[in-house]
Swiss-Prot record:
Species classification: Eukaryota, Fungi, Dikarya, Ascomycota, Saccharomycotina
Mitochondrial matrix side: 34-48
Name of this protein: ATP synthase protein 8
Subcellular location as annotated: Mitochondrion inner membrane
Function: Mitochondrial membrane ATP synthase (F(1)F(0) ATP synthase or Complex V) produces ATP from ADP in the presence of a proton gradient across the membrane which is generated by electron transport complexes of the respiratory chain. F-type ATP synthases consist of two structural domains, F(1) - containing the extramembraneous catalytic core, and F(0) - containing the membrane proton channel, linked together by a central stalk and a peripheral stalk.
Species: Pichia angusta
Major subcellular site: mitochondrion
Keyword Translocase: no
Self-association and partners: F-type ATP synthases have 2 components, the catalytic core F(1) and the membrane-embedded component F(0), linked together by a central stalk and a peripheral stalk. The central stalk, also called rotor shaft, is often seen as part of F(1). The peripheral stalk is seen as part of F(0). F(0) contains the membrane channel next to the rotor. F-type ATP synthases form dimers but each monomer functions independently in ATP generation.
Molecular function terms, GO-annotated: proton transmembrane transporter activity
Entry-linked InterPro entries: ATP_synth_su8_fun
Parts of the chain on the Mitochondrial intermembrane side: 1-12
Membrane topology per record: Single-pass membrane protein
Keyword Transport: yes
Family, as annotated: Belongs to the ATPase protein 8 family.
Amino acid sequence: MPQLIPFFFLNQLFYGYLALFALLVLVSWVILPYLLQLQIVRLLITKL
C-alpha cells in the first residue's frame, strides 16, 4: 500500500490538491454558469 509509505505523502497531497483545484475551476467556470443560464431561461419561459 503506497499510501502508508511516507515518501508518497507529498506526491499524493500535491495531486490531490491539483485535482480539487481542477474540479473547482470546472465547476465555477463551466457548470455553474450553465445552471444559472438554464434557471434564467426557465424563469423567462414561465413568465410568457
